[in-house]
């Protein structure tokens, strides 16, 4: 997938330029992402029904994972790109350069954190194994490739790194608030009941630093490419 031509750095575009290869690639990625998300939702909800927790509890647990929310974010972006120039204004909002970048930063770190921190304690089988591969190992690199191909040179400002951080920051607030009310935490490094607030907040701070650094790196890649800085 070749990268689009250089655009002026001084006036970042609100809309990306979509050609047929990009549209087809985005469509394939959207199908992969939505299929994995739907299959994983079916597995997760039915597991909790079988345990006697009910479907609503299953949905709550399913939507508590950053992996799920980030893959849904990426699937929305990919769908918006796949719809092409005729997409509505609402869909075009999802494919603005800052939104694509925010999704790319988060999905990259989803893959990295899972591989290094969670893989050893997670052992899915059957269909769930296939979903796990898609959500943690296929979508992350493919979406970063989509980001590289879709976001033009000079399309980002430094403040877009803050946009990229807003999503995981909001998730952290959600996780701790939900945990305080429901007593459940999706990840061991956030589990206040087991490691305490001090360790959980320290882990959140460490991940925040990672998100900020990666966000600035993504912006720098596109800004630097435009001007040679």
Predicted segments — roles?
Residues 66-67, 128-141, 201-205:
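Membrane-interface loop-to-helix entry segments
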Residues 54-61, 95-96, 122-135, 158-161, ...:
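Non-cytosolic membrane-interface motifs at loop->transmembrane helix junctions
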């Amino acid at each position: 997938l070749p990268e689009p031509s250089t655009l002026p750095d001084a006036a970042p575009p609100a809309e990306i330029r979509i050609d047929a290869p990009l549209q087809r690639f985005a469509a394939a990625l959207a199908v992969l992402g939505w299929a994995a998300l739907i299959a994983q939702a079916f597995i997760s909800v039915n597991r909790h029904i079988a345990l006697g927790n009910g479907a609503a509890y299953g949905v709550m647990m399913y939507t508590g994972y950053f992996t799920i929310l980030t893959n849904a974010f990426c699937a929305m972006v990919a769908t918006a790109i796949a719809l092409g120039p005729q997409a509505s204004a609402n869909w075009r909002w999802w494919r603005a350069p800052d939104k694509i970048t925010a999704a790319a930063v988060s999905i990259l770190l989803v893959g990295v954190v899972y591989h290094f921190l969670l893989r050893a304690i997670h052992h899915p089988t059957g269909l769930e194994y296939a979903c796990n591969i898609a959500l943690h190992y296929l979508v992350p690199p493919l979406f970063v490739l989509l980001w590289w191909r879709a976001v033009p040179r000079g399309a980002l400002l430094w403040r877009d790194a803050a946009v990229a951080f807003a999503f995981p920051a909001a998730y952290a607030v959600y996780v701790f608030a939900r945990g305080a009310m429901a007593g459940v935490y999706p990840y061991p490094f956030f589990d206040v009941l087991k490691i305490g607030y001090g360790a959980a907040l320290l882990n959140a701070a460490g991940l925040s630093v990672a998100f900020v650094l990666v966000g600035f790196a993504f912006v720098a890649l596109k800004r630097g490419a435009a001007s040679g800085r």
